A protein has these predicted regions:
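N-terminal beta1-alpha1 cap of cysteine-dependent amidohydrolase-like domains
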Residues: 1-86
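Beta-strand-turn-beta hairpins that frame and shape the catalytic cleft
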Residues: 4-7, 142-147
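A broadly tuned "polar low-complexity/structure-edge" signature
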Residues: 20-21, 27, 132-136, 148
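Cysteine-nucleophile active-site neighborhood
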Residues: 67-144
Length: 148
């Protein structure tokens, strides 16, 4: 490797949150880093091994799952809420896609229940009549350009 850099990625619950092939997002990150001469070391936190060490984490990745799996993961993450919140508030990078982002909000409402989120983001999600799938473009006063 050209410059001996390493990036530590923690993939949270890939065994439960992989509804739309989110392992592919990790593979894509690894490849794009490789092209830049950066090794990506991926650690996982799974339903059978709940250990998370954020001390050396450069990126935390959370994918999406069905309501059932997201509810399981949310209950597990709530036990680590302070640790994850401190990580983010101290400049840690957390990438959440699909339903994974709803876990970061105050709550998300499913067809049957209201699930408490981590409250890291000041958002909430209400289930609609139809499932929305596709790309999102955001604009915010915090950023000078659109976020895709």
């Amino acid at each position: 490797m050209a410059n001996n850099q390493e990036l530590n990625i923690i993939h949270l619950y890939p065994d439960l949150l992989n509804l739309y092939g989110d392992r592919g997002n990790i593979a894509c990150m690894q490849k794009r880093l490789e092209w830049r001469g950066i090794d990506a070391k991926v650690s996982t936190c799974t339903n059978s091994d709940h250990s998370i060490n954020l001390e050396n984490a450069d990126i935390i990745f959370v994918g999406g799952g069905s309501d059932r799996e997201q509810e399981i993961v949310c209950s597990l993450l709530l036990k680590k809420k302070d640790e994850i919140t401190n990580y983010v508030e101290n400049g840690g990078v957390l990438v959440a896609v699909c339903g994974g982002y709803q876990l970061l909000g105050k709550y998300y409402q499913t067809a049957n229940s209201k699930i408490e989120g981590l409250g890291i983001l000041d958002i909430y999600t209400d289930a609609g009549d139809t499932r929305l799938i596709g790309n999102v473009v955001l604009e915010s006063e915090l950023f000078s350009q659109k976020i895709c």
